[in-house]
Amino acid sequence: MDDGGHRENGRHKAAVQGQWLMQHQPSMKQVMSIIAERDAAIQERNLAISEKKAAVAERDMAFLQRDTAIAERNNAIMERDSALTALQYRENSMVTAPAANMSACPPGCQISRGVKHLHHPHMHHHHQQHHIPQLTENAYETREMEPNDGLPTSPPAGSTLESAKPKRGKRVNPKATTQTAANKRGPKNQRKVKKESEDDLNKIMFVKTTHDYTDEDSSKHILIGSKSDWKSQEMVGLNQVVYDETTMPPPVCSCTGVLRQCYKWGNGGWQSSCCTTTLSMYPLPALPNKRHARVGGRKMSGSAFNKLLSRLAAEGHHDLSNPVDLKDHWAKHGTNRYITIK
């Protein structure tokens, strides 16, 4: 070991250990450059975040525009469908009205103005003239044929004697047997002949009388009819519209000033959610003596609702894609005591 405390083999060197333990101190320039790089990275990150937010906002705007375009397309499709249904209803009413008039019009009548199909009375007149001789011929044939069927045919003398001979050997007069058989079968057949001939004469007279009607008499004959006939003729011209909950919105009531959707009631009927015959408020008051129940609103049956839809569609005043306001169409009679709150 020398004076400095160092060993010759180099194991113990205090000065060398002091050099390794010293840390490298960066300069001020290096610190400033590192801070500047960090600030630049932060700015780039903030720019990227702002660009991302702008892209998300543009995407949301595109989504909104797409949704509005889809809604407009759906509205256009619904308007087109409603217009097509209205046109179809009118075409069907124009087609069915002349057919109803043709079926209900006797000879010589005049169809109201505005109907495309006209009735030709001379063709019906020719058809009746052609039909009358057939009836008269059939009547004469029945008169000629029926009495022969009613009177018994006289069989040969030998056959009557053989069939009329009793087993004990008694002789029976063949004239008496034929007369008794005729007496047994004759009156009923004669009645039948008279009845059929009278029916044929009635048919002929009915055709003649209907043929001899003038225009005024025929118009009077049309006006004289039962109320059910008039009602059936009116209903033939109307198109029966059936409510379809998949394509048509439920009806509403605007008695409170706000459109309130109605409740389903019965078989296709509807019940008001905001009015009774004496009260108009929403919601209707609850019953104190009945749990989960309110005062019953005004009602409309399913058949009445379908008739209302048919009338509105025939008049063309209402678009079936919009809900029907039942404010002025409710039934005049009373309602049930309560409705269940759902």
Curated annotation (Swiss-Prot):
Residues 41-76 are annotated as: Alanine-zipper. GO terms for cellular component: nucleolus; nucleus. Transmembrane segments: none annotated. It is found in: Nucleus; Nucleus, Nucleolus. Residues 41-67 form a coiled coil. GO terms for biological process: response to ethylene. Pfam families: GAGA_bind (PF06217). Keywords: Coiled coil, DNA-binding, Nucleus, Transcription, Transcription regulation. Belongs to the BBR/BPC family. Homodimer. Heterodimer with BPC4. This is Protein BASIC PENTACYSTEINE6. The gene is BPC6.
